[in-house]
Amino acid sequence: MTDVDPHATRRDLVPNIPAELLEAGFDNVEEIGRGGFGVVYRCVQPSLDRAVAVKVLSTDLDRDNLERFLREQRAMGRLSGHPHIVTVLQVGVLAGGRPFIVMPYHAKNSLETLIRRHGPLDWRETLSIGVKLAGALEAAHRVGTLHRDVKPGNILLTDYGEPQLTDFGIARIAGGFETATGVIAGSPAFTAPEVLEGASPTPASDVYSLGATLFCVLTGHAAYERRSGERVIAQFLRITSQPIPDLRKQGLPADVAAAIERAMARHPADRPATAADVGEELRDVQRRNGVSVDEMPLPVELGVERRRSPEAHAAHRHTGGGTPTVPTPPTPATKYRPSVPTGSLVTRSRLTDILRAGGRRRLILIHAPSGFGKSTLAAQWREELSRDGAAVAWLTIDNDDNNEVWFLSHLLESIRRVRPTLAESLGHVLEEHGDDAGRYVLTSLIDEIHENDDRIAVVIDDWHRVSDSRTQAALGFLLDNGCHHLQLIVTSWSRAGLPVGRLRIGDELAEIDSAALRFDTDEAAALLNDAGGLRLPRADVQALTTSTDGWAAALRLAALSLRGGGDATQLLRGLSGASDVIHEFLSENVLDTLEPELREFLLVASVTERTCGGLASALAGITNGRAMLEEAEHRGLFLQRTEDDPNWFRFHQMFADFLHRRLERGGSHRVAELHRRASAWFAENGYLHEAVDHALAAGDPARAVDLVEQDETNLPEQSKMTTLLAIVQKLPTSMVVSRARLQLAIAWANILLQRPAPATGALNRFETALGRAELPEATQADLRAEADVLRAVAEVFADRVERVDDLLAEAMSRPDTLPPRVPGTAGNTAALAAICRFEFAEVYPLLDWAAPYQEMMGPFGTVYAQCLRGMAARNRLDIVAALQNFRTAFEVGTAVGAHSHAARLAGSLLAELLYETGDLAGAGRLMDESYLLGSEGGAVDYLAARYVIGARVKAAQGDHEGAADRLSTGGDTAVQLGLPRLAARINNERIRLGIALPAAVAADLLAPRTIPRDNGIATMTAELDEDSAVRLLSAGDSADRDQACQRAGALAAAIDGTRRPLAALQAQILHIETLAATGRESDARNELAPVATKCAELGLSRLLVDAGLA
């Protein structure tokens, strides 16, 4: 990173400052750094025996400035407890009049130093730093202090790698950069444009500086770094006039770049309103990208008494004239021991092995929703640790622990129960000093445990019951500052209220979540049969494990039901959240413990199989659905993010069943209304499948049919034909057959899937429905033009082109009056017909004409167009262009989905050319994937590549059985779809691979034939049969081989090499094969030489290998 603070270092400080520091009570004064605003010394404060950093400002201040400086630093002293603001230990003025600030000594130096030495940080670390610094700035702004100089050099790093902001307000006090408009307080590269232009600094300018700092952390340099030899004023002009460099070009997620761009917006009004808003935006980016979401510590309202529970408030008293204390209420002994028996538990060695591997990490966190066996596992681990000689305390959390003093008192009591002599006096300190004693008590506890050199573990059970921020901070302090003599084992519904991120970075966290806690089949058998006294066969145990998803509570409830005489078969069939025993458990232990607002939200959110913020808001009639979902997730309410998209959430199936049952109590009308809301939201957001499901669930099939018929996403254009047909299957048949548009959509899907019979049926029903529909004549004409395009597609897929031009004429004569898919498909269909007529040069203008309409379609039209360009180029022996076209088609198809219909379709043609150019491995991978399409997709050329070249690849790889299977399936497809040209390709390949043909088929192939020249498809079919005849004859006696050579020569001579270059080359190679077979070696060599040269130039190495000529 280049120098981000170009201000010249001031070196005019008087040399007696060390002496003045000694006079002020500091020892061992050592200069450790200089900056634009002063000199920093490392000193020792003998009175407290600690190392500190003392910054002495380089400017003498008048009375007003001095008072303002002291006032601002005292204000910051009120925030010294903020985890991301450097603590101000002392401020004052030296004998020589220079102000100084005393801070903790940071051995790890600054963020600027870290970047200089190790380079920029990745975007995940940068987001984390940004959230924390935003909280620090917000805290300062709330007490009326601006920073004025946020930059990497003013962000120090703690021993744990945490960022802390320092030097608040010093830039204003110590002077700055002078411009024509006055003095600029701060470093230019990180200063907001409006401040550079002379405006006063505001919280918005601090927001800009924070954004500029994050830009630097990501890139290793300032956005407007001062260039070599550049004058400061020129740098100012760039900052105030030029946009920031685009971070997306560095491969960063778009939302990361956008968040920083908003913070660095040119105009203050375009930036987030507050630093807290910046932090929340960065937290949202973390959530969207599936990374850990950092907390943004903000202070409670200063000067306002902390809210307490009524009981705590009543107990609040003053002792003497000093600090308020909160007496600890009477506590039952059961709070300090496990509530689960350990003798009859299922031994979960799989999990205790994980805990054992965690060693002495400071925190072992066991988190999952209710009923997953967290406390049971913690109790088992407590027993194991005790056997190993550790002292293990137990503390069960309850509502009383939402008071910091009470929690600390309970914590001390739990420890004294296993180590009576430990921390004997600390309880009295709490009683006497209350809230003010927390930090002292925790520090003393840590020191005493360390000095005793004794291993102590504390199980804190049900931590999720704590919501008080001071109690959470107390445990966080214990975890952050503890030593390896003390280990905390925490069970909770979630990670909330714990410094998980910091501990993970320091490798001080071992974690077991709900996925690990789920019982496997062996553990379930031990629970049900061994511990539960049942005798269930393994198949039933496995079925129960699957139906409960390994949820311990459900398995135990199932065991209780079976021991009570329940029917095992009935239980296995119907165990769900609607079961009485599970319903009762979830009611008592989960739902009924929630506040009414959250309980109601969970009920309505459960209507859909999955949900997100917008959907949940629509269902509940609120604006903060996302926040409510995250609250439910944090509280472990059986809600988790989906694996494929962290913006979506899904309830545990049993909890969803339970919520559905509770929701139904409100009546069917309410449930129907929620389904209608869900359908509307899904439709508006492009989720047709779910929109239809919920319209049907709402009892509104007419709306469901309307949604499919009016679908603007047009699923076939998205290569989602089977999805469309599956949706249609859900609709009432009587409604479907009467909708002309819907029948047309069904025809589209079936034709593209190479299903001629269902497609024809849909087109027939379309005509009937259109005749009965009361539609304007113009609309009917448009629909009929679209239907004719579909019929043309069906014709070319059936390997017929005679009627294609007539069927396309209407659509191609008025393309702009029709939906884009109609002319887009018409152009592709006309191009395919041109290929079948060997009019390769005509293909490109047709596709160029269709391209604007295809750009307005889904990707399927583009995939087909690129494939057709590739087919024309390959036939013309433009192999480079063909490869490029096929690759483009494959990439577009893969963007739809790696296993999409479009990707597999393009993959078959790309694989064919890869094989011909010698890439056997690449061809094999693509062919295997394409083969999964079967007969559903493409015209004969696609099917031939899939089956014929697919078989040839298998044979080349030594899998002759696989090759035979491919050809057998291809032969069946040719018969089923009535495709003589495909059948001819299959027969030809069987001969090539030495697979015997039926005698009658061989006899037909050997018979003399005249090759027609007026029909391209008939020509290609006859040429294939003639090629097959030549190969059959070449395998016979010498007379047959002579005849084969004559017929091969005639075949090659009849093909116009100018019009059909690829076909002519293939025919030449066949003729050379027969020359060699008849012993005419000299003739074969003479003909082979130019052919081999051409193949080498084109890269078609496999043509000669397969012919045995290479």
Curated annotation (Swiss-Prot):
Superkingdom of this protein's organism: Bacteria
GO molecular-function terms, A-Z: ATP binding; metal ion binding; protein serine kinase activity; protein serine/threonine kinase activity
Segments of this protein annotated with the region Disordered: 308-343
UniProt cross-references to InterPro entries, sorted A to Z: AAA_16 (IPR041664), Kinase-like_dom_sf (IPR011009), P-loop_NTPase (IPR027417), Prot_kinase_dom (IPR000719), Protein_kinase_ATP_BS (IPR017441), Ser/Thr_kinase_PknK_prd (IPR016236)
Sequence positions that bind ATP: 32-40, 55
Class of this enzyme: transferase
Domain Protein kinase: 26-283
Protein name in the entry: Serine/threonine-protein kinase PknK
Originating organism: Mycobacterium bovis (strain ATCC BAA-935 / AF2122/97)
Gene: pknK
